[in-house]
Amino acid sequence: MRNTRKLEEITFDEMLELASLGAQVLNNRSVELAKKYNVELEVLSSLNPIPGTVVKEVTKMEGMLIKGVAKDTDVAVITILNVPDEPGTSFKIFGLLAQKNINVDIILQSTGRDGKKDISFTCSEGEADTALRVLKDSGKFQDVTCDETCAKVSIVGAGMQSHSGVASKMFEALSNNNINIKMISTSEIKISCIIDRNDADKAVSAIHDMLFD
């Protein structure tokens, strides 16, 4: 990737998001403990003696909109078709998954039609078979599909809370590279898109070039 650079500082929350989104830098638990007890961390290189990136509660770089781009290729999208468009349907679905400790990430619900709707969600590829089996064995959901050719690309940065247009630039980068977005999830400091797995590396480079060049 072109024009990468080291961050001087990053917040605990930003580092936690990046770690959970596939950035292989720090273990989630280590950052959670550091945040809990407000202990600063420094990410160093074993090959280079220069100062590293400090992970702390508040940084001096809050004006920097985006702190990182991450990808996760361990993603499956499961879609349940033609479920009743009525109260309690989502509880029945995700209650079954929770009983099997299946971690659900992004959820997308279609607009209801003729009393029916479709619900899609993402989970790890390793949990996809279990999720399919649980849903079908319940006898309530038989029309279930699974797409195991997906990836998630995300941008993280606390600066997004006070600046508009970041999502637009991310989507523009993907559009310019003919990358289709299947699902979108946002929070105060994160935007994630589900795309085709074969496009993951290209997407990360395109987003980085759009937001950091």
Protein language model annotation of sequence segments:
Residues 1-213:
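C-terminal catalytic "cap/lid" subdomain
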